[in-house]
């Protein structure tokens, strides 16, 4: 049985896991910091209070539950040992025959982190709910404004 480790439970990682699930001689392990898949294209809807966070996040295990040879582990990967063919996480290491890195991206201010308070990222549920909080707070402040202009 060939062991495949997929780092990342986003669109790319899930697509690879689903495609490989058709193979009979493959054991798949998906590693992700979170235990849910986030449908990022709708994060703006959470930020604008149109959708709730639960409406755009689904458990990764549930999405991949059809294949008994697929396991999903909540694991933050800290290193990859290419010579020993191991992925090293905060809690454990995982051996592989094939490795797929589908980690996604993080918001970057190119060394200008002070911009974050004025231009927050929109890549996570925490960021979306913080933007939502700011928008709703601005509406509340506007309601109590005595000068309408």
Question: Model regions: which residues?
Answer:
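FAD-binding core/adjacent interface of flavoenzyme oxidoreductases
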Residues: 70-149
